[in-house]
């Protein structure tokens, strides 16, 4: 644990701001690509763009762990389950940020469907809850997110996603703690089976546009190298992925110039 760094963050940002409600992205592959992931179909599409679930033809599940700035109290754990059926694809997700007296939970139920060979859409109902000493009496709240993916061909994919358009939030003793709406749009191009380049822009209320880019390449079969950059402030990301039969394992690292390294790992299964 990095107690001095945690104390410093609390002093600079304050408890309420540091632990403000947030929709945390998950998946070590996504983190390694600087979360430029709005157009990518993946086990963790339940946290990025539910439209990506429509591209799944088989059951998939994953578990994820992240240690923000290598501080145990700021850890993030998550799980995702994808179940294709005749009518479309269901997704179930859960995440928990924090540890000890502070915990922030998100539960999601998603449904996605291919509207045509090129257009895919998805929607997810979310329930957020948060607990720490200053808001022990706070209640959770429900919201939703929805997205679309368009693929004019087998190499180019374009995606758009909006989270919490109703700007819901938790009622506390100090008033309503709102959660910002987030809009993301971007795309990726698969040059061949070895190279993928992804670009995304994100807009959150009262904050500047955030540009995110990532590149993934396979020097050999089943082994992926990933790099990304986003800002401002500038964050650099990198990671590896390895697949063996029906299991893939990814590790990702994000580096913040002032706050340090955030390591992550995820494991995905397909049946």
Give the label of every model feature segment.
Residues 8-9, 55, 170:
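A ubiquitous, low-specificity "background" feature that marks scattered single residues
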Residues 2-5, 22-24:
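Short, basic/polar N-terminal leader/transit segment immediately after the initiator methionine
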Residues 34-36, 42, 47-53:
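Alpha-helix capping/hinge segments and adjacent helical runs
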Residues 19-30, 37-41, 58-61, 66-271:
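Outer-membrane beta-barrel porins/channels
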Residues 4-14:
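Sec-dependent N-terminal signal peptides
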């Amino acid at each position: 644990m990095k107690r001095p760094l945690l104390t410093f963050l609390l002093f600079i940002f304050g408890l309420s701001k540091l632990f403000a409600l947030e929709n945390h992205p998950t998946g070590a592959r996504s983190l390694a690509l600087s979360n430029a992931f709005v157009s990518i179909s993946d086990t963790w599409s339940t946290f990025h763009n539910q439209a990506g679930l429509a591209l799944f033809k088989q059951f998939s599940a994953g578990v994820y762990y992240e240690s923000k700035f290598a501080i145990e109290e700021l850890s993030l754990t998550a799980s995702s389950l994808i179940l294709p059926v005749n009518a479309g694809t269901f997704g179930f997700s859960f995440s928990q940020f924090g540890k000890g007296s502070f915990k922030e939970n998100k539960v999601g139920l998603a449904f996605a469907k291919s509207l045509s060979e090129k257009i895919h859409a998805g929607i997810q109902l979310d329930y957020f809850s948060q607990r720490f000493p200053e808001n022990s009496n706070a209640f959770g709240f429900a919201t939703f997110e929805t997205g679309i993916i368009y693929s004019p061909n087998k190499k180019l994919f374009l995606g758009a996603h909006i989270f919490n358009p109703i700007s819901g939030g938790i009622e506390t003793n100090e008033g309503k703690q709102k959660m910002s709406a987030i809009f993301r749009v971007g795309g990726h191009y698969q040059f061949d089976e070895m190279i993928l380049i992804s670009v995304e822009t994100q807009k959150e209320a009262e904050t500047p546009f955030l540009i995110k880019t990532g590149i993934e390449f396979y020097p050999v079969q089943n082994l992926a190298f990933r790099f990304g950059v986003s800002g401002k402030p500038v964050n650099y990301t990198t990671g590896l992925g390895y697949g063996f039969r029906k299991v893939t394992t990814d590790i990702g690292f994000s580096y913040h110039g002032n706050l340090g390294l955030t390591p992550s790992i995820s494991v995905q299964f397909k049946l």
